[in-house]
Amino acid sequence: MLDKNLLLVDIGGTNIRYAYSNIGDLSFVSENKAELESLNDFDNLISELLANSVVKNIVFSVAGPRVNNSIKMTNRNFQIDADAIRKRFNLESCHLLNDWESIGYSIKTFSENDFDDFKESEPFNENFLVIGPGTGLGASVISGNNVIATEIGNTNLGLPALKSLLKINSDEFNAVSYTHLTLPTKRIV
């Protein structure tokens, strides 16, 4: 039996990833990734992930806007409700975060060398914007210890500037979600 008390689940637009840890611990075990073809058997998946562990706490990171502790995904017919999951699986806690909200909270675990800035400047406060491509375009705003979740999604807003920055000259791309980007950096800030 796995002795970890926390299950972390990331449900993105394309893949689902999960790992086990303990609350307050930055290390993970049993990290897994699978293509996200269907979430029809979501309850069965969670049951299987909880079966051989002492997990009583789950944190979900899901692509989509969070409203009233629930997220309806932007690119598929799936909705997740943290309160219902906590009750259904008899959990102590079940937290639901927008995917880029999760990234925003994780930023302080990285060092300055892990980031590339779009524009060099002298910092004058603790606010910054984190953006990045995935199935859609994601972003979060960080102000001190607070993270403001966003949902840009599949959009062409700002696409000319992004294509210019990344030196993409083709008119073939008319939405960020159609662009697969490989960048020589670990993070974009």
Residue ranges with predicted function:
Residues L2-L45, V147, I152-G153:
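Short glycine-rich, Thr/Ser-proximal phosphate-binding strand/loop in the N-terminal lobe
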Residues D3-K4, L91-E92, F124-F128:
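Short coil/turn connectors at secondary-structure junctions
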Residues T14-I16, G136-L137, T179:
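Ser/Thr-glycine-rich phosphate-binding loops at phosphate-binding pockets of nucleotides
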Residues I23, R76-Q79, F110-F118, G144-A149:
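A glycine- and small-aliphatic-rich helix-loop capping segment at beta-alpha/alpha-beta transitions
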Residues N52-L96, E101-D114, V130:
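Short beta-strand-loop/turn "lid" adjacent to the catalytic site in phosphate-handling enzymes
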Residues S102, N113-E122, F173-S177:
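A polyampholytic, Gly/Pro-enriched intrinsically disordered region
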Residues E120, F124-N174:
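Glycine-rich phosphate-binding loop of actin/hexokinase-like ATP-binding domains
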Residues T179-T185:
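Conserved small/polar residues in nucleotide/adenosyl-binding loops
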